[in-house]
Amino acid sequence: MDSQGPIILEKSIKIEEVIKIANTSIIDIVTKTVTPEIKAPYELVDVEYDKMGSDYILSILVDKEGGITVEDTSDLTNIISPLLDTIDPDPFPNQYMLEVSSPGLERPLKTADSLKAAVGSYINVSLYQAIDKVKVFQGDLLAFDGETLTIDYLDKTRHKIVNIPYQVVAKVRMAVKL
């Protein structure tokens, strides 16, 4: 502090935004650390770091052709856990539980390649910006050309087609058709 007193920030940041930024940094660091060590036949699908109740959970979602077994998750945990201990400086502000698991039926689709592979599948798409006043679409992915997702969805009782620019997509995951 100088003789003029404390500096007051003019722009306030919500604590939730700070936590989200910190979590993104942790996810990036963990992803860079574990990706080279998850070798074929396994595929790293996603890394998530969230607070559940009073606990922090680091989830590493891994898959392989035909699905992963409990033994696979155990083997991968034995590879990943020591790797996380080598990260310096330690990015984790609190103790956490490591969870290595399958992405399940509603697996996230994080890359353009995973979206191309999902053409013909039933998906859920969340948007940063609404299209026709809608921010979440659920339907069949008809096409993805790297720039636009084309989805056939049900609006009440009528099928509609929507073209969604990839840059407004916040999150995409597989969905279960009921």
From Swiss-Prot:
Main location as per UniProt: cytoplasm
InterPro entries, sorted: Ribosome_maturation_RimP, RimP_C, RimP_C_sf, RimP_N, RimP_N_sf
Keyword flag Secreted: no
GO biological process, one term: translation
UniProt entry keywords in alphabetical sequence: Cytoplasm, Ribosome biogenesis
Database matches in Pfam families: DUF150_C, RimP_N
Biological function: Required for maturation of 30S ribosomal subunits.
NCBIfam families reported for this sequence: PRK00092.1-2
Protein name: Ribosome maturation factor RimP
